[in-house]
Amino acid sequence: MSIVIEVKAIPKSKISAITIDKLGRLCIRITSAPENGKANREIIKLIAKTLKLPQANVEIIAGLTIKLKRIRITSSFLNEGELMNALLPSMQQKLFE
C-alpha cells in the first residue's frame, strides 16, 4: 500500500523534526542545507526512521527542488490513520518545546 503526503521542507533548521505549521501543514525541519540533494536525503531518512521503515520505502515524487514536496510512503502495514498516529508522537514532542 502506498500513501502520498504533502510536506513543507524547512532546511537549515537547528534540529531535525516533524512539526505542523500555523496553517496545519506537515513540516519537515532538517539541519541540512538545500544543496546537492542533502536536504532531500535527510527528509527521507527522518521519515523512514520515524515510521520504522527502510529508506527505500520513502520517495520524494514531486518537489525535489522546492520546499513543498509530495512524498510516497510504501508499507504493507501502514494505512493513512496509522501513518498519522506514528508521526503524532514526534510532532507533539516538538510542538510543545
From Swiss-Prot:
Please give the InterPro entries that the UniProt record associates with this protein.
DUF167 (IPR003746), YggU-like_sf (IPR036591)
Output the Gene3D superfamilies linked to this UniProt entry: YggU-like
* GO cellular component entries: cytoplasm
Query: Pfam families from the xrefs?
Result: DUF167
Q: Which SMART domains match?
A: DUF167
**What is stated as this protein's family in its record?**
Belongs to the UPF0235 family.
**Which NCBIfam families does its entry note?**
DUF167 family protein (TIGR00251)
Q: Which HAMAP family match?
A: UPF0235
What is the name attached to this protein's record?
UPF0235 protein Aasi_0294
Originating organism: Amoebophilus asiaticus (strain 5a2)
